[in-house]
Amino acid sequence: MERTLLQWRLLPLLALIVALFSFFFASPRSLQGNNKCSLLPHDHYWISSKRIVTPNGLISGSVEVKGGIIVSVVKEVDWHKSQRSRVKVIDYGEAVLMPGLIDVHVHLDDPGRSEWEGFPSGTKAAAAGGITTLVDMPLNSFPSTVSPETLKLKIEAAKNRIHVDVGFWGGLVPDNALNSSALESLLDAGVLGLKSFMCPSGINDFPMTNITHIKEGLSVLAKYKRPLLVHAEIERDLEIEDGSENDPRSYLTYLKTRPTSWEEGAIRNLLSVTENTRIGGSAEGAHLHIVHLSDASSSLDLIKEAKGKGDSVTVETCPHYLAFSAEEIPEGDTRFKCSPPIRDAANREKLWEALMEGDIDMLSSDHSPTKPELKLMSDGNFLKAWGGISSLQFVLPITWSYGKKYGVTLEQVTSWWSDRPSKLAGLHSKGAVTVGKHADLVVWEPEAEFDVDEDHPIHFKHPSISAYLGRRLSGKVVSTFVRGNLVFGEGKHASDACGSLQLATT
């Protein structure tokens, strides 16, 4: 009888021990809670991985997160003596843990054109792709973000509807470019920098700028130490021969309408004023960032020369320029239309070479969706279809999948997608797995393969217009943390949209 009573007394104790063990060392699959912002029930925990990308290299170890901040990063050999209190441990094993991606070039089309994308679907796609912060472009929404009043509309549209952190670029257009007080009021309202087009944007309330507008914009930005992003193409007269080769369903017909000389001419003009951004120059403190570079020849040579002279200039390219080539684009498949255009395979190789050597600074998605009917997929008319590639959810596996043959490393991916974008956008609390930074983290399995099809949930609004449909990719995102909240894990999103607006304050 006494033995039986002892057994009954021990059972609750054993159950408690088992429960505590399960609580402290649970696998990611078992985490559930009542916090609607997060799939985790608490805000203090450790994340362990055999592959953690830190500023000091790749380590096997653990990251402690508390209150949305990284409070310690320790190597595996030091972890047990560093763990002062018993808190939950999430062990991801061989999966890679690295800073969340920061995508500085996204069109979410909200407010005004949310039928193209919208904050909810776009930021869900970002979370599912390991993007923890994105910066929304000032055009394709309506109205365009060119004043404090239009920025306020965008801020209101984003509230309680974003699943990751979001910042905004403002627009540099002729109406505000020569009015320093107008630009200052837009910058004071919180945009992270400005964006302009040197060719028609295709959006009526976002007209193109000339080099005078850009020079004046840089002089204002110098006071704020924020960047100017420029779509660098200048229209020139074209000589296109008549004939069947100019069939609008042929991608080569479209390619001829936007030759490399357009990019080269725009960049040459830009670099005539960026000397002012050098140390001691009249626009010192300003910075020029060339978006979505497509031409890897003369345009890139000009940029390299300007950098060598001390101009404050950076340049990005996009996954679609690194993944595709003009030769492989099927007739009438307007999903591949964008501007600048995807160029030939030799150009693609040069882009990879420049990226690997550091001449191209970073990557961005330039996620630019629209309604499927504007893609004219049934007609296949490249000359009339809306230009833009939908890729937001897949930029990490695309970069990894197509980069493997070039020897891309995890540290390089982190530099291109986290570290350098954080510096460009002035998001200094983000971009690295280090103490004091936001706990913006992505966990992913580089070796895991998947097909971009109906069996793999796609969260941006119009999957049918993505050029990546049917592609097999390597690199599956397992979990995404935004300021400590597990916003995406094991294929599920947290129920509430608790992303934070990233507005400039100084």
Swiss-Prot record:
Family: Belongs to the metallo-dependent hydrolases superfamily. Allantoinase family.
Keyword Mitochondrion: no
Gene name as annotated: ALN
Entry GO CC: endoplasmic reticulum
Further remark: In Arabidopsis the intermediary metabolite allantoin plays a role in abiotic stress tolerance via activation of abscisic acid (ABA) metabolism.
N6-carboxylysine PTM positions: K195
Protein name: Allantoinase
Pathway the protein acts in: Nitrogen metabolism; (S)-allantoin degradation; allantoate from (S)-allantoin: step 1/1
